[in-house]
């Protein structure tokens, strides 16, 4: 019996090498494209474009506050600054809100572990003890990789990261951060900037009529 003749593989040779190179290029291109879709999300340029959770854990779109002035604050119940700040925030919200202005409070336990309560209890505590009527959202993290995206937007825009409770970020009707204040700064310092922005909102609404 004669041995079988050895035949050369058809895929060997220059054409096969070219095909392999082209296939590698295509695979690399597809892989890079998929990675871009996964990691390169469109840049959000407005605070009001985010969604957050309310104190009961329900999703809330911040779009509802677009067109108003907002003072966004990281709050805490067991801080030496709690009384003064909650009362001051209540005063501002009563004076300028709710049609043209709102305080938006985000509880956080990362600064001195001053907010150990669950979100619902934080809201109840603030309403009962200080009579606040402004929105109090779900407890969040601000620092680290688990930082709430909406609040991180404020931090990144202002280049100012909170170092304690009750940092305040003033957001204009378009969702841009225009100013920030540290917790020890009195309400009297904050009021003129809020008043100026609210005045602009009122004038614009009259012009649009």
From Swiss-Prot:
Domain of life: Eukaryota
EC number, as in UniProt: 1.11.1.9
Keyword Acetylation: yes
Reactions performed catalytically: 2 glutathione + H2O2 = glutathione disulfide + 2 H2O
Membrane topology: Single-pass membrane protein
Molecular function terms from GO: glutathione peroxidase activity; peroxidase activity
Chief place of localization: membrane
Modification type N-acetylmethionine: residues: 1
GO annotation terms (biological process): cellular response to oxidative stress
Record-given protein name: Probable glutathione peroxidase 8
The organism of origin for this protein: Homo sapiens (Human)
């Amino acid at each position: 019996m004669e041995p079988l003749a050895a035949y050369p593989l058809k895929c060997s040779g220059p054409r096969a090498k070219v095909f392999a190179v082209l296939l590698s290029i295509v695979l690399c291109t597809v892989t890079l494209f998929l990675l871009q879709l996964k990691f390169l999300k469109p840049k959000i340029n407005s605070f009001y474009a985010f969604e957050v959770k309310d104190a009961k854990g329900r999703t809330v779109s911040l779009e509802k506050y677009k067109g108003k002035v907002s003072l966004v604050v990281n709050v805490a119940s067991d801080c030496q600054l709690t009384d003064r700040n909650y009362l001051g925030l209540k005063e501002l919200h009563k004076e300028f809100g709710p049609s043209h202005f709102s305080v938006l409070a985000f509880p956080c336990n990362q600064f001195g572990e001053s907010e150990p309560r669950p979100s619902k209890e934080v809201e109840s505590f603030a309403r009962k003890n200080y009579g606040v009527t402004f929105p109090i959202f779900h407890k969040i993290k601000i620092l680290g990789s688990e930082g709430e995206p909406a609040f991180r937007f404020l931090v990144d825009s202002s280049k100012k990261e909170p170092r304690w409770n009750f940092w305040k970020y003033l957001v204009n009707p378009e969702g841009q951060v225009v100013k920030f204040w540290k917790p020890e700064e009195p309400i009297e310092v904050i009021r003129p900037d809020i008043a100026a922005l609210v005045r602009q909102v009122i004038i614009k609404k009259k012009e649009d009529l």
